């Protein structure tokens, strides 16, 4: 690739990065247009070209991040991290890029090749469809005046991404500005996102993703009450437990020693809850990455009485700390970056922030007050399976179109964020 083409290619990756990372199941107040199934198929086809490699990368993230501290809540977005890493890789020197690609296998190469091969008009068509689907929360690119202005114009040409020109030498003012900007974008869900900035920073990529689970069928708010959650043998906390009885996908694995239920949400997403047997959390934690797929394949549609705590969890981590954990090094050094700049100092900062919130909310605005809404047509002789999440469990938010994990979470103690 010629040096002159780099800004265009990178800007296209940033477009996709911002859009793919901006997935939210929160009900939108307005919708510019309805997305047709054909549009979703085209988006899915774009992602399927690197599906096998993405899954391997996501599994590596799962094993590394979830297992490293088994007694701590953890949440991250593998799709968000992988797309952002693909973005960063296109601005790296060959040696560093090879290190990143070794971890992601050919996934990054595929993404780069796709972007260079597709006509801009075709890309823009998909981009606009994605904007209409997920426009509420977007990645922001924050850099300073040393960045080549043609590079910035190319980004602005293809999408109105949020670009803030900031002097990173004024660290305190810059941190405050970034934190306020992101907080305003995601309804104050992120606090103190940026805690450290190097004065020599050239570009800061803030990668945030917020999921508010709007369920197809809400929980009954009048049944929510305080109950015990058994963190471990010595620790019991009181949490708000939600309840509902309905037919849903249910699975039981004696191999994994765990039970799974799947709850549909709006916007083609589902929440998958996996409950390890009592005393088997550590066993399930070690086996989950490899055996979860089998658990989902052997499922049944059954009447379930579900009891689960309200969930609000978040994690923020600098890529500088996150990536070495999965074997990607030297990505943020002054020797790594080759982006077209007007200065000589080139330090890159990138932050990942994931937030998930699941409450009683459903698609029907007044569903909790509608008695007919709660009538479940079942055989009176049928006894529901009781699944009570009163001990540590796993949570996955899955895209029903691509079957990708938008979020992966380990809920060890619902009382701590």
From Swiss-Prot:
Modification comment: A series of at least four post-translational proteolytic processing steps and differential N-linked glycosylation generate various molecular forms. Three mature forms starting at positions 41, 45 and 100 are produced.
Endpoints of the signal sequence: 1-25
Propiece span(s): 26-40
Positions of glycan attachment: 132, 222, 268, 340
GO cellular component entries: extracellular space
The keyword Hydrolase is annotated on this UniProt entry: no
Induction record: By progesterone.
Localization per record: Secreted, Extracellular space
Chief subcellular location: secreted
GO molecular function: serine-type endopeptidase inhibitor activity
Transmembrane segments: none
Keywords carried by this UniProt record: Glycoprotein, Pregnancy, Protease inhibitor, Secreted, Serine protease inhibitor, Signal
GO BP: any one term: female pregnancy
Site residues by UniProt (Reactive bond): 378-379
InterPro entries: Serpin_CS (IPR023795), Serpin_dom (IPR023796), Serpin_fam (IPR000215), Serpin_sf (IPR036186), Serpin_sf_1 (IPR042178), Serpin_sf_2 (IPR042185)
CDD domains in the cross-refs: serpinA14_UTMP_UABP-2
Family matches, as SMART domains: SERPIN (SM00093)
Amino-acid biosynthesis in keyword set: no
Comment field (misc): The UFAP are a group of three (MW 42 kDa, 48 kDa, and 50 kDa) antigenically related, basic glycoproteins secreted by the porcine uterus.
Record note on quaternary structure: Heterodimer with the iron-binding acid phosphatase, UF.
Protein family (similarity comment): Belongs to the serpin family. UTMP subfamily.
Matching PANTHER family: SERINE PROTEASE INHIBITOR, SERPIN, UTEROFERRIN-ASSOCIATED PROTEIN
Protein name: Uteroferrin-associated protein
Organism of provenance: Sus scrofa
């Amino acid at each position: 690739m010629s040096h002159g083409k780099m800004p265009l290619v990178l800007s296209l990756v940033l477009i996709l990065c911002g859009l793919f990372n901006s997935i939210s199941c929160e009900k939108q107040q307005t919708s510019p247009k309805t997305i047709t199934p054909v549009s979703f198929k085209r988006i899915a086809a774009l992602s399927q070209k690197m599906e096998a490699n993405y899954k391997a990368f996501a599994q590596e993230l799962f094993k590394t991040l979830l297992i490293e501290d088994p007694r701590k809540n953890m949440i991250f977005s593998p799709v968000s991290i992988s797309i952002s890493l693909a973005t960063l890789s296109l601005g790296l020197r060959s040696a560093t890029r090879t290190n990143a690609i070794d971890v992601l296998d050919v996934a990054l190469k595929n993404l780069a090749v796709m972007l260079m091969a597709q006509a801009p008009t075709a890309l823009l068509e998909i981009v606009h469809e994605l904007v209409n689907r997920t426009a509420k929360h977007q990645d922001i690119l924050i850099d300073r005046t040393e960045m080549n202005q043609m590079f910035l114009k190319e980004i602005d040409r293809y999408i109105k991404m949020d670009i803030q020109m900031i002097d990173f030498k004024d660290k305190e003012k810059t941190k405050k500005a970034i934190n306020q900007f992101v907080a305003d974008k995601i309804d104050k869900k992120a606090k103190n996102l940026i805690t450290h900035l190097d004065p020599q920073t050239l570009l800061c990529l803030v990668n945030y993703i917020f999921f508010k689970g709007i369920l197809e069928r809400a929980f009954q708010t009048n049944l929510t009450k305080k109950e015990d959650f058994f963190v471990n043998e010595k620790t019991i906390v009181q949490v708000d437990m939600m309840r509902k009885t309905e037919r849903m996908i249910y699975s039981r694995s004696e191999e994994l020693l765990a039970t799974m239920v799947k709850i549909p949400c709006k916007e083609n997403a589902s929440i998958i809850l996996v409950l390890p047997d009592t005393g088997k959390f550590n066993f399930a934690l070690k086996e989950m990455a490899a055996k979860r797929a089998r658990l989902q394949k052997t499922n049944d549609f059954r009447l379930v009485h579900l009891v689960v705590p309200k969930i609000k969890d978040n994690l923020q981590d600098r890529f500088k700390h996150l990536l070495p954990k999965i074997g990607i090094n030297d990505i943020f050094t002054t020797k790594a970056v080759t982006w077209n700049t007007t200065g000589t100092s080139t330090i890159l900062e990138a932050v990942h922030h994931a937030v998930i919130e699941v409450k009683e909310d459903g698609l029907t605005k007044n569903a909790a007050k509608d008695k007919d809404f709660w009538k479940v047509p079942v055989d009176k002789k049928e006894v529901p399976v009781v699944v009570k999440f009163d001990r540590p469990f796993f949570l996955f938010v899955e895209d029903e179109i691509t079957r990708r994990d938008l979020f992966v979470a380990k809920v060890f103690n619902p009382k701590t964020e």
